[in-house]
């Protein structure tokens, strides 16, 4: 994916956030599927590292997606036990809080207002630095992100109902759709924001590719693109 390659080479923390977010989502899925505590503690650890990297979004995505996932499965009790795990909270606090405590001690209220309120809440409430867009701002970006395998992505959405019936695939769909919806509603829009949900879509495309692998024509756009490069 060209956008993923570009963000991987950009001088920003977004590639690291995407990596840590993907790791936290994977461990969260494993915990709610296998109910083994090591996966839950891994989720807290990766979320804490993501929180250090880019802030609250690293916590919001796994918390929101797992909540919706558990509500749909009628397992809100399991979600509550996971989110409020004392050991998990301790792991998160030991990793993430010291830096924020030090920054708050140095800068006081200015750090809280600037980092949390302005650059997180403020970005959602309205456009900053002219980065606005319509509700469908991310649609062409997603289409570009899945090129040259656009046909596979489209087929995933055509077979949406089938994937929705499978618990793992539903989790991946929720991951992608939550990020897409959240940032589509955000006042500030930047192209790379939607990348935080694309791993979920990419994994669904990989599943579809296993079914779709006999249709060799799907690789023609990829060969043309790499030939031009």
Residue ranges of each PLM-predicted region?
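Membrane-integral, polyisoprenol-dependent glycosyltransferases
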Residues: 1-217
């Amino acid at each position: 994916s060209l956008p993923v390659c570009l963000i991987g080479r950009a001088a920003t923390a977004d590639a690291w956030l995407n990596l840590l977010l993907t790791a936290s989502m994977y461990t969260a899925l494993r915990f709610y599927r296998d109910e083994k505590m090591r996966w839950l503690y891994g989720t807290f650890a990766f979320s804490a590292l993501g929180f250090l990297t880019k802030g609250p979004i690293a916590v919001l995505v796994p918390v929101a997606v797992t909540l919706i996932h558990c509500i749909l499965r009628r397992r809100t009790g399991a979600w509550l036990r996971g989110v409020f795990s004392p050991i998990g909270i301790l792991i998160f606090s030991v990793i993430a809080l010291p830096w924020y405590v030090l920054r708050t001690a140095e800068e006081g209220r200015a750090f809280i207002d600037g980092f949390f309120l302005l650059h997180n809440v403020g970005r959602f409430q309205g456009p900053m630095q002219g980065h606005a867009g319509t509700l469908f701002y991310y649609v062409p970006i997603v289409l570009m992100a899945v090129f040259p395998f656009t046909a596979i992505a489209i087929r995933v959405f055509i077979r949406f109902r089938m994937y929705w019936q499978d618990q793992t695939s539903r989790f991946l769909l929720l991951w992608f759709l939550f990020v897409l919806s959240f940032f589509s509603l955000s006042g500030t829009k930047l192209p790379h924001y939607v990348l935080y949900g694309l791993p979920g879509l990419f994994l669904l495309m990989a599943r579809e590719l296993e079914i779709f692998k006999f249709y060799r024509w799907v690789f023609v756009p990829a060969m043309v693109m790499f030939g031009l490069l």
